[in-house]
């Protein structure tokens, strides 16, 4: 039975999803959940890319105690040095170095010859090996690279000290047959194939990321890279939950085992979906809302008689608890804290007190507080506590001729209260125009989405917005409230606050 490592890049490649932007606290929260999930390696970011990314990688490296943390780096000494500095507090640091090997990338992006690429790989892998025990090399766009040159580049990296070789299907171009053959070729040509770890990194442009990752495992890969929910650039990455469950359900075929705690997938998926603002499609494999629903009468009859007739995956396997009892206003602190632990949250004593207080307020307004309500409660508490601006007052009124007016008062982190008013063609536009005046920013709303957290007339509204500022930076905001307009204002204020804070940090860096 072979052991397959899981390498999660939700915080790096996953964050490249348009409209997704995690802050430091959110990234730490995700990383801690990935640790509970049993992920072997967490790719925390690209330290050289920005001061913010450096600080995120540094914070995650310090917070994680039971798995490896890695950072991305180009074949540049400065990148490697920056990664070393960011990861110095990690219990088990690794580095991930990449350089393109396809002709189109070398000619048009790198403007380097094959000889220059090989020399760069040799030098920088050797340089990194002096600083890290585990060095992973990725020949970017491997599946469109000349096969002989790809093998030469991989051999060069191994000879220079690489301990992990990752084969990226950067643009989602390959198929399972071709990808499996590529790993067979590597196994035949690379003399140290069994002495180091080979990995796959697949994209889903043609809908084959999971199939390609499994083909790689079938043909010798011992590490799989991907993200939770398959989020990522363009069509996304390999969905790790799909690979993990496939290996478990078809252990007879793949003969593989992992460190993954399968019943933590639902918690992981829910957390990342809410923080990213990307809902999980209902028909998504493994963790979609319809994954265990049966509409056909024949199917329903079969499942009632024996679930094995139509279910190869039980809901409980991935952490879907259909029998979880809702909490109510008579539920005590112990029951609440126990449920938080079951849902995967790690809260400090003060956070527990604050969350329980909010829970009691919520329980007074709702007959039953469901697990979805609790996820929203923790998400709201986490996001609002990190905000520099808090909504204190909102008033909307009809003016004339279909025009709406809004008065908004916010409190800044230093306690200062500011208030302004504006109009718009509707309530939402009036509120957002007012917030723009208060924040003194030129903001474009690019996405607005509202959903009910639970069923019923007493459901809370959860609003997600995506905005773009005048510098082209994109920010995501979440607002939760029983009142739709208040939830909308909270979401927009949060996103605008992130934009304003980021602009201040950028200005500070320029002054430095």
Curated annotation (Swiss-Prot):
Keywords: Amino-acid biosynthesis, Branched-chain amino acid biosynthesis, Cytoplasm, Leucine biosynthesis, Manganese, Metal-binding, Transferase. GO terms for molecular function: 2-isopropylmalate synthase activity; acetyl-CoA C-acetyltransferase activity; manganese ion binding. Residues 390-512 are annotated as: Regulatory domain. GO terms for biological process: L-leucine biosynthetic process. Mn(2+) binds at residues 13, 201, 203, 237. Residues 4-266 form the Pyruvate carboxyltransferase domain. Transmembrane segments: none annotated. One of its GO terms (cellular component) is cytoplasm. InterPro entries: 2-IPM_HCS-like, 2-isopropylmalate_synth_dimer, AIPM/Hcit_synth_CS, Aldolase_TIM, LeuA/HCS_post-cat, LeuA_allosteric_dom_sf, LeuA_bact_synth, PYR_CT. It is found in: Cytoplasm. Pfam families: HCS_D2, HMGL-like, LeuA_dimer. Its EC number is 2.3.3.13. SUPFAM superfamilies: 2-isopropylmalate synthase LeuA, allosteric (dimerisation) domain (SSF110921), Aldolase (SSF51569). Its main location: cytoplasm. It catalyses: 3-methyl-2-oxobutanoate + acetyl-CoA + H2O = (2S)-2-isopropylmalate + CoA + H(+). It is an enzyme of class 2 (transferase). CDD domains: DRE_TIM_IPMS (cd07940). Its cofactor is Mn(2+). Pathway: Amino-acid biosynthesis; L-leucine biosynthesis; L-leucine from 3-methyl-2-oxobutanoate: step 1/4. SMART domains: LeuA_dimer. Catalyzes the condensation of the acetyl group of acetyl-CoA with 3-methyl-2-oxobutanoate (2-ketoisovalerate) to form 3-carboxy-3-hydroxy-4-methylpentanoate (2-isopropylmalate). Belongs to the alpha-IPM synthase/homocitrate synthase family. LeuA type 1 subfamily. Homodimer. This is 2-isopropylmalate synthase.
